[in-house]
Amino acid sequence: MMRSHYCGALNRGNIGQEVTLSGWVHRRRDLGGLIFIDMRDREGIVQVCFDPKYQEALTAAADLRNEFCIQIKGEVTARPGNQINKNMATGEVEVLAKALSVYNASDVLPLDFNQNNTEEQRLKYRYLDLRRPEMAQRLKTRAKITSFVRRFMDDHGFLDIETPMLTKATPEGARDYLVPSRVHKGKFYALPQSPQLFKQLLMMSGFDRYYQIVKCFRDEDLRADRQPEFTQIDVETSFLTAPEVRAIMENMIRGLWLNILGADLGKFPIMTWNEAMTRFGSDKPDLRNPLEIADVADIVKDVDFKVFADPANDANGRVSVIRVPNGASITRKQIDEYTQFVGIYGAKGLAWLKVNDVNAGLEGVQSPIAKFLSEEKIKAIFDRTSAQTGDILFFGADKWQIATDAMGALRLKLGRDLGLTRLDEWQPLWVIDFPMFECDEEGNLAAMHHPFTSPKDFSPEQLEADPTAAVANAYDMVINGYEVGGGSVRIFDPKMQQTVFRILGIDEQQQREKFGFLLDALKFGTPPHAGLAFGLDRLTMLLTGTDNIRDVIAFPKTTAAACLMTEAPSFANQQALEELAITVVTKEE
């Protein structure tokens, strides 16, 4: 037997038992007549004592070094009272080693477990990085999450059905990873950005509750919380309304938090997209932050200050304000830093007003813009914001999108900088009623979610007549400012689907070429259906308390979409390229 117990699972209940442990030397201490090691496996660390009573084991232990892979046979004993370590799960016991075997020695590590290593080092030697207890714990938590999800879905009648990895390229927002076909030269498969169309086809096939924990691929510019390959908890249902789908998924996430963290998320509030953007400047608001954004365009329409008056009188403009309680102590240097910060989001400036005495009107404020405001305007702004003595007001005035994005970002930064965001809380919510379409950079309409999302209470004729007025029957789940999942009611009427395609500039020939199989399937008694998908990586980030998505993936890519350990991507050999009829064209610098 190589192992009878895990190191990290030993406790007082094992005292007196003979055990066989297998794992790694985490740390070694030579105290002259005694040698102690901390021995580690995936479940944790236990202290092992080598005593002269078992001289052969003690002699062999003298040659041990960190990360040797070893086996210990010995007896679990109680630690003396003055040696109990309450910071270790196994801190009340130790193992008296009677026999030691070395499976494998270790070279000097290129990583130092006791210090910060660069992320490049950690990714290059990922198999060593994953030995660290905190990394092992994150992957164990990820496994617990998927195990819980599978049990929940099975208990609620969902079928785990796999969908193809080699499929057809369809426009879903990001670039596809393409796979050349050897058999069909010149043609390519695409790796799926999501199983969206296949899961809808499964609903048309009669499998009314589907789920899958599935890899997805997007060839897009990466951010800190994005990976080229990522994992979704993918869900689709037939004959359920949007509120019914949300209720099931909310129960799953509530159960997940209770199971992993022992935290009760309570009932999730529901907020419209418009309310989220207006009050919080974001479609994924962090409700742990108490600051809110108020609109004051109606108050400042006629002031002699073009910075306010122009956007206030523009149908596409916005003048908004954030009140920071007790913020009057913020220095001019800090205000300048915040002004620079909102510039990142396109804002041309940041007006401010300190409330030294809320009852003194203009006499009680300090601000470069005070000269443009009357007593009546000041009072109206105070009433709108519930301003109090000692507060500071920050104003954003610009085109609606710029002002909203800038003030939303400023709200988050102020919450962090001033310690206002309650970091010990969980604040989930649903955001619903998104616009059906948004304008892209060229001014063309694009689907805010994807082109298979159904509008709310719109006929095809109404949608074609006024597409920008349509509200999508879509919903996102947000927790602490992170969008953890999103979905929608799907289009199940072929006429509506073709209407949406036309609005998006996809003509009939392109519709047949790209989506002919879907349009055909919609003709044969398609049921009403709805679904959503959760980002497993992001859920795991939240549940393990890390802000780096690479911490919760066993073998992640860098922000340049490279694997430093295997050195992927790599060049293909010439024979393989010839079989695929591919010629590599290199551009000169």
From Swiss-Prot:
GO terms for molecular function: aspartate-tRNA ligase activity; ATP binding; nucleic acid binding. It catalyses: tRNA(Asp) + L-aspartate + ATP = L-aspartyl-tRNA(Asp) + AMP + diphosphate. Its main location: cytoplasm. ATP binds at residues 218-220, 227, 483, 535-538. GO terms for biological process: aspartyl-tRNA aminoacylation. NCBIfam families: aspS_bact, PRK00476.1. Homodimer. HAMAP family: Asp_tRNA_synth_type1. This is Aspartate--tRNA ligase. It comes from Actinobacillus succinogenes (strain ATCC 55618 / DSM 22257 / CCUG 43843 / 130Z). The lineage of its organism: Bacteria, Pseudomonadati, Pseudomonadota, Gammaproteobacteria, Pasteurellales.
